Amino acid sequence: MYEVKLDAFNGPLDLLLHLIQKYEIDIYDIPMKALTEQYMQYVHAMNQLEINVASEYLVMASELLMIKSKLLLPQTSIEEDIEEDPREDLVGRLIEYQNYKEYTEILNTMKEERDLYFTKHPTDLTHLETNESWDPNQTIDLTELIVAYQRVKNRVELNTPKSVEIKKETFTIQQATAQVTERLKQHESFNFFSLFTFHEPVEQVVTHFLAILEMSKSGIVNIKQTKQFDDIDIIRGVNYSIG
């Protein structure tokens, strides 16, 4: 017995998204019978090959079967108006995962390019200023996090000669994740900007950003902002563990 990832998928949501794209399924109107059958074929194939399927895939299989069963239950017209679509939560998670995946691919491409060299003048973000009201209890989306990342990167560039080749760095996402985790051991939350001295290479800022993005996706951290375009706070998430 040995354990592998199902066809190199990063978890059950990744597998489901692959099936949706492969069979051109409308993500907002998923045919649960067809999708469940395709998903179960993957899991069954792994069992037939005596591969130890990770428990998260089996949990998702149970969830798919439950959703499929609910959709098969007879309902009155009144119940149909009141009851939520049992697919709603799954669709929301798939869309969120799809967005994270797209952003991560873009940022990984940026990092690969910067690992070779990078030359850029500071970017003016004053056009992003606004006087609109802002709810401090609102959970921010990826746009605000990217704006905060851009602010850090610009400050780093201000401390870097305008035309300089930045040599390849060895700072990894694992190291960045370890730094964030260590900071969370000491504090329940901390300011995103406090991770930086603004003298480190731009690649290190990008790597920290990718690490926080992955930790947010995994529920290890939450990201909050008290005022629009203000500092970003990194907070312990529901899946955070001191270890």
From Swiss-Prot:
Coiled coil: none annotated. GO terms for biological process: cell division; chromosome segregation; DNA replication. GO terms for cellular component: cytoplasm. It is found in: Cytoplasm. Keywords: Cell cycle, Cell division, Chromosome partition, Cytoplasm. It comes from the Bacteria. Gene3D superfamilies: 6.10.250.2410, Structural maintenance of chromosome 1. Chain E (1.10.10.580). Pfam families: SMC_ScpA. Component of a cohesin-like complex composed of ScpA, ScpB and the Smc homodimer, in which ScpA and ScpB bind to the head domain of Smc. The presence of the three proteins is required for the association of the complex with DNA. Participates in chromosomal partition during cell division. May act via the formation of a condensin-like complex containing Smc and ScpB that pull DNA away from mid-cell into both cell halves. Belongs to the ScpA family. This is Segregation and condensation protein A. It comes from Staphylococcus epidermidis (strain ATCC 35984 / DSM 28319 / BCRC 17069 / CCUG 31568 / BM 3577 / RP62A).
